[in-house]
Amino acid sequence: TDMQTTDAFGRPVPITVNLDDYTFDYSLMQDSYTPGNYSQATADQVAALSYACGVSFAMIYGTGASGTYSDSAVVSLKAHFGFPNAQLLDRSTFTDGDDVWMNIIFNELSHNRPLMYSGVDDIWTVGGGGHAFVFDGYDAEGLVHVNWGWYGRNDGYYAVDLLNPRIHSFHNQQDMIIGCESPSQASVRTDTLRVEGEV
């Protein structure tokens, strides 16, 4: 897998990784990394996974921020990470309504399939910036638990229509990647998902 980033002077820097050379020991990866609370082996495993994801997702690295697009991520999840059922859903083109959108989220989370979710903040809409984060649960009130990827800061339960940690509100241009499960866990899927009643 090849990608390209830029150096501090804006010059292109190619990056290549052979994902066949990587094996990941998920049992060594911790849920949280705080200074003095992890070994070199656990740090190496999560660093290797982060690097492989970054390169294969065609991450654009910068000194102030880094990013990629959800469509690049879903292609890589299917091709390189053993998630053949991964699928990208774009809320702006989703025609089945908000209730069905939310039922898809609840269904995925009820089956222990975390969601990669993305949105664009009001303050970044003009410039096109956004943020990707993980939904990993929901509560009885229909709020989703969000891991923002900011060292645990602001992680908690949020309304999907707001997604408003601190000064942000990632309610624009939302999309999500569903179906992140290994083939051995996968159930038979169809092209159209219809949810009726409560999930």
What are the roles of these predicted feature ranges?
Residues 24, 28, 35, 40, ...:
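Intrinsically disordered, low-complexity regions enriched in small/polar residues
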Residues 110, 125-129, 138-197:
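Cys-His-centered catalytic/binding microenvironment captured across papain-like cysteine peptidases
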Residues 50-53, 67, 76, 116-119, ...:
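Generic detector of bulky aromatic hydrophobic side chains
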Residues 25, 96-101, 157-159:
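General structural signal for secondary-structure boundaries
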Residues 75, 79-147:
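Active-site-adjacent substructure of cysteine-protease-like catalytic cores
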Residues 1-94:
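Cysteine-nucleophile protease catalytic domains, especially the papain-like/related folds used
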Residues 12, 38, 56, 64-66, ...:
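Compositionally biased, intrinsically disordered low-complexity regions
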Residues 38, 42-65, 104-113, 167-181:
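Short, Φ-rich (hydrophobic/aromatic) sequence segments
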